[in-house]
Amino acid sequence: MVFGKLKKNDITNRYYAFSSFPGEIKEFYDKQLDSEIHTISYNNYQIPSMLEYHLKPLKPSISINGPDYHPVIFEYWYQDIELTGQDLYILQKNSNELQRISKDCEDYSLLKKFLTKRDNSIISEFYLYSCKQFSGEIRKLPTLLF
């Protein structure tokens, strides 16, 4: 019961921000996407974490970090995964980041836009893109050396 109280009084939208993942996004992934293709997110570690938690994809979801973003554990967990030359799905919360990573794709197209709502108000938008033949130029791993 405590969670219900917290969720109802959540002024940060923390409990709502990814509420489209177990429903609409999971359904789209299950019915429309190729499970053999990795999903990446640029400069965002939360999206791959939520995909792993809610969708449990066959191929791991990965955060790709640019030089302007702090290193995250994905860089070390998956540094051996070769993405260069592969087709990928890109899921982003901010459409501005998509412009940065689109340069690394031979072909780039919007598959679907997902809306997350709270009480009929949109609190976040997620953009799912298809990236053909990822060049890998943006992925310089690891960005933090021990």
Please report, for each region that a protein language model flagged, where it lies by residue.
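Short periplasmic/luminal acceptor-recognition loop of GT-C membrane glycosyltransferases, typified by
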Residues: 7, 11-71
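Aromatic/acidic, Gly/Pro-rich catalytic loop(s) in extracytoplasmic/lumenal soluble domains
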Residues: 29, 69-146
